[in-house]
Structure formats: structure tokens, C-alpha cells
Amino acid sequence: MSTSPAGPAAGSTGPLVIGGLGGSGTRLVAEIVQELGCFLGDDLNQARDNLWFTLLFKRPRWYAEAMARDPQEVKVGFRILERAMVARGELDYAAFSFLGRAVREAMLGRHGQTRAFTPGWPLAQSSRLVRALRFATPHEGPWGWKEPNSHVYLRPMAEHWPGLKFIYVVRHGLDMAFSRNQTQLHLWGPLYGVQPSAAPGVPQPQAMLDYWIKAAERATTDGRRLLGERFMVLNYDTLATAPDRVLPGLIDFLELDPRGLPLDRIRALAVPAASSGRYRQHDLSTFDERSLDAVRSMGWAVD
């Protein structure tokens, strides 16, 4: 399907996007960014995921087909998201066709998810999204969203929004290897050349670590090449344990004046996850040395 031109809305400065692997600490970063005055959407779950992005883009089967067929199709979805969130840009038939297909595939279980959506969820989300498209509320300040899967779309987003800023949240790879949150491995692993070694829910630390490495390498390489200073790698472990080592850089990245910001309230949000350091309870000899060297090269101790 060939789509109409899908550039950013006139006057758009581009969104701030927060992505990373599920369970890497993106929720904490989203909470901090909200405290700093960035609008992340009206339809969020408890983890601060923007559910409109989830509906429109958490679709591995469609993504592979669209990028092979017509990469511009992906950008139609970006226009929908921007219009719904900040009332910028106009929609055409291609946009409503895009939305309709996303809803239909979600309802029929064709998103490529590891488990089906809750019955009625796609209709509820699309209803709120359509209402926002019809009665969109302008937001003049900084805006964006947090949805871990966003990093998969970094390349087309960088092409679509010249002013895009992206925060890639990364957590110790060995902690992530033993995470029960395997969703991205099963959804996107093949895109990165990583095949899950077991069914969803079954521990597969080597495959999880391989995906962590591949995703981080691609995000950082693409982010620095395409965005330069508008790309930030944020270390969750440091943020959660020593926020004052991270907050000044984050505030500078967001181009904010630190005077008057609720820094005490933000520091109070930074509490390490109970699972931090869980890798120490496991036998690391199950990992190949190449993977452990990659973890070390990215700045984490392996002990």
C-alpha cells in the first residue's frame, strides 16, 4: 500500500521519547520527566506506557511487512500519535486506514504478541484515541511518550521528526538476563538476529542477554549517528542509587533551567528495584565469555 506524504506537523519541535527493554527502569525515567513538565499523554497505564503507541506500533508482524513494503507507512502512525497528543497536523484516509488495521489486527490476535490482548482492549483504546483526534487539546510545552518498544522505531522516528530527542534507558545486562519480562525478546528478537531458546515464561538467560546486547548496540549506534546530542543513554542503576550523578545531565539534555525544579521530590522517586543485583544469585558460567565481555565493555562490572 502506498501512503500519502507523512511528514511532521507544521510547527512541531519533535517529541521526547523514552525507550528501552521492558523492566529496564523506563517507568522511573517517565515519572521524573513528568515532574520536569513534559506531557507524556492522557492514556497511560500504571507503568506510564503510552497505550496509543502500544496499539499503533507494538506490532512485530506488521512492522516487518511495512518496512519491506513501504517505510512511509510507519510514519502515518506517527502523524496519528502527534495529532492525538498535541493537536498538530491533519489526518487523511491513510491515517484512518492505518488505525483501523491496527485495531482489527489486535482484535483478531494478529499483532504478533506473545499473548492475546484483553477482550475489548483494542476497541476501548481506539475509542479514546478517536475522541482525542476529533477533540484534540493543544499542548504547547514539551511533549512525548514513554513506551519501551519505541527504541525499535528509532530510525524512522529520527527521519520523521528533525527535533526528536530520545532517551534510551539501560540496566545491568545480567540483571536483565534473568528478568521474567521476556516480551521484547519474543516480539523483536528475530529482528535483531536473536531467536528465543524456549517458550515465553521459561528462563532463557543467554538469549535474553544476547537481545540486551543487540538492542543496546543498535540503539546507541543509531542514536548517536542520527540524533547526536539529542540522544541520551541513561543508566537506570546509577539513577536509582545515586540520582544526583544523573539528574544534572538529564536536566541539561532537556534544556531546562534547574532553578525552581522539584528536585527533592524527584530524588524521592529514585528507589532501586528489589531485583537489582539479582544476577549475583545465579551461576554466570552459563554465559559465553563473549557476552560477558560485552557487558563489561558497556560499563558494568561482572562479579
Feature roles, as predicted:
Residues 39, 163-164, 301:
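A general structural signal for well-ordered secondary-structure junctions
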Residues 1-17, 21-22, 34, 68-69, ...:
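PAPS-dependent sulfotransferases, especially Golgi type II membrane carbohydrate sulfotransferases
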Residues 44, 58-60, 170, 183, ...:
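Alpha-helix boundary/capping detector
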Residues 1-124, 269:
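PAPS-dependent sulfotransferase catalytic core
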Residues 104-122, 131-261:
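PAPS-dependent sulfotransferase catalytic domain
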Residues 45-49, 170-172, 262-266:
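A short, structured active-site edge motif that brings together acidic residues
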